Design a protein with these regions (language model features):
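N-terminal pre-domain and mature-chain start segments
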Residues: 1-113
Length: 113
């Protein structure tokens, strides 16, 4: 496996969410699907995709909405925990989350208006 390089998201065209600890870009506002989620540390946002993260091994986890298989995500810049990606949802009503990403609001620097 080769070296991974950070992706820089163009802030002139999009509102960028970044890691509060190191400033690494993680996602843009146009990739946000919902602000109505709960993470390990409180409020969380659901995104269609993110960049500059490392994925952990898949793990089964009981969550507020049932049992899921998830991969924890860490920031590529500082290795801080930032959220998780949904690999599998066992409940049919939760399957829309598969492939989507949760980012913890407590670790995000949000776009400034």
């Amino acid at each position: 496996m080769g070296m991974r390089h950070k992706v820089f998201l163009d802030q002139r065209q999009k509102d960028v969410y970044s890691c509060r600890k190191c400033g690494t870009h993680l996602a843009t506002h146009d990739q946000m699907k919902s602000t109505n989620f709960t993470g390990r540390h409180g409020v969380a946002y659901l995104f269609l995709s993110v960049v500059n993260v490392y994925e952990g091994d898949p793990k089964e986890r009981n969550m507020l909405t049932g049992r899921h298989v998830v991969r924890d995500l860490s920031c590529m810049g500082c290795m801080a925990y930032v959220g998780w990606t949904y690999v599998k949802a066992y409940a049919r009503s939760e399957r829309y989350k598969e492939g989507l990403v949760i980012l913890e609001v407590s670790i995000l620097d949000r776009p400034r208006k």
